Every structure is written in C-alpha cells, then in structure tokens.
C-alpha cells in the first residue's frame, strides 16, 4: 500500500534537500520518490544527507513534466502554504494521510511538493484534487522542504498503522475514481466542445475552464459518472456536425 504513495518534488534546486527528503520518507516507510525536472541531479551531497536512505535516491524516478509524475494516479494532493485567488478543496495533514492511505489500497496516489522558494504554480495546483496546508506558527511558518515532507509522511504512516490495527480492508476506498490521465482527457474534450459551441473564446478560455476544473474537482465524479459526461459531450459534438 505505501509503495503506491508517490512523493513528488517539482524542480528541486538543492541536492541536499533531495537527500533530506529521502531520509524523511524512509523513516515513515515511504520509498517512492519522483523528481520533476530537477534543476540539479542527485549527487554525493544528496547521498550523504539521505543518511542510510540512499536507495530511495537511487530508485527515484526522474521525469520532465508533472503530468508524467501524475500519470496513473487517482488522487493528487498538492502542498500550498499561501492563499490563492482561486479557492480549492483543502485538507489538513491528518486528513491528507487518511485519504492517501485509503485510496492507495487500490491505485497510486501522488503527494506533490513545490520549489523551495516559490512552491507550486497555480497551474500545477489546479492539477490536484486537494491542497494540503500545514498549520505552522503564523509568526514563523518557514518549513523547509524536508520538514514539510516529514509532517505529511508522518500522517500517512499513522493512517497506515491504523489500517493494520483495524484490518487492511476496513478503510479501503471502494469507489472507482478516474485516473488523472482520464480527467485531463475529459477537460480537453470539454474545452473543445465549449469552443465549438461558442460558449468560450479560443483566445480567452482560461477563466471559465479554471472555474469548471474547480467545480469538477470539488464534485470528484466517479469513473462511471465521468463516462456519462464524456458521452454528453460526444452527443453535443454530433449534433453540431449535423447542423
């Protein structure tokens, strides 16, 4: 189950942080590390700061885009330290741990951490089902990357231990949710349909599509429900072709 939980680091700029994150992960039983377009490659400093978790560094998946790191996942949670202009469903670390473990029983889950200085972009955060914020001291809320990973990884482990005590099947998520790849195809299909009907303009699709993403993220349709929505879009396209 824990192997299904990916820790995804976006454009990390310090190899020492990679090593410290690997150590934070392994102490909590997590080993599935993904590096998205790292600005530096893991080196001897990363190995040194991993302190016995060099296998996590050595087995890390290095990819060019966030989409590659999220492929195959049914749940994506992004860390966010500041309020955004576009509200999004929020979790605290404990809720994040519970949801991640429940869903990881069946499909991969991605926990996404942003750049050391600026975090995740709004576009990256919109690829997430939920955002998670750590309730640090508001007068000094400066958590480094490894600290943030440690907090979330601890809550994941606590949730996982609870399932071991209560029986593996007790908290498993049974609802079949679509994978991130399926959702992105749906959003592409939706945008094309709205363009073809004239509901949105080709040079200004962003605001409407952003709000629709938020709507469907909040509703979180099941796989069967998403198929119905795709069928509706296909029917609209057929009607337009017949005109």
Swiss-Prot record:
GO terms for biological process: tRNA nucleoside ribose methylation. It catalyses: cytidine(32) in tRNA + S-adenosyl-L-methionine = 2'-O-methylcytidine(32) in tRNA + S-adenosyl-L-homocysteine + H(+); uridine(32) in tRNA + S-adenosyl-L-methionine = 2'-O-methyluridine(32) in tRNA + S-adenosyl-L-homocysteine + H(+). The keyword Transport does not apply. CDD domains: SpoU-like_TrmJ (cd18093). Its main location: cytoplasm. Homodimer. Belongs to the class IV-like SAM-binding methyltransferase superfamily. RNA methyltransferase TrmH family. This is tRNA (cytidine/uridine-2'-O-)-methyltransferase TrmJ. It comes from Salmonella typhimurium (strain LT2 / SGSC1412 / ATCC 700720). The gene is trmJ.
């Amino acid at each position: 189950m824990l192997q299904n939980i990916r820790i995804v680091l976006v454009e990390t700029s310090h190899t020492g942080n990679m090593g410290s994150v690997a150590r934070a992960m392994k102490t909590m039983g997590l080993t599935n590390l993904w590096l998205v377009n790292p600005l530096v490659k893991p080196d001897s400093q990363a190995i040194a700061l991993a302190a016995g978790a060099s296998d996590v560094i050595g087995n890390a998946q290095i990819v060019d885009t966030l989409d590659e790191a999220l492929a195959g996942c049914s749940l994506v949670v992004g860390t966010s330290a500041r309020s955004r202009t576009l509200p999004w469903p929020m979790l605290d670390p404990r809720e994040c741990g519970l949801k991640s473990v429940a869903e990881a029983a069946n499909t991969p889950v991605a926990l996404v951490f942003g750049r050391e200085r600026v975090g995740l972009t709004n576009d990256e955060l919109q690829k997430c089902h939920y955002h998670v914020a750590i309730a640090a001291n508001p007068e000094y809320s400066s958590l480094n990357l490894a600290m943030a990973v440690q907090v979330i990884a601890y809550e994941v482990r606590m949730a996982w231990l609870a399932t071991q005590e209560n029986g593996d099947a007790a908290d498993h998520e049974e609802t079949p949710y679509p994978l991130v790849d399926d959702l992105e195809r749906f959003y592409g299909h939706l945008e094309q349909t709205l363009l073809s009907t004239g509901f949105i303009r080709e040079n200004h699709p962003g605001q409407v599509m952003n709000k629709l993403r938020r709507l469907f993220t909040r509703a979180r349709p099941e796989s069967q429900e998403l198929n119905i929505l795709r069928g509706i879009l296909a029917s609209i396209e057929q009607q337009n072709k017949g005109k």
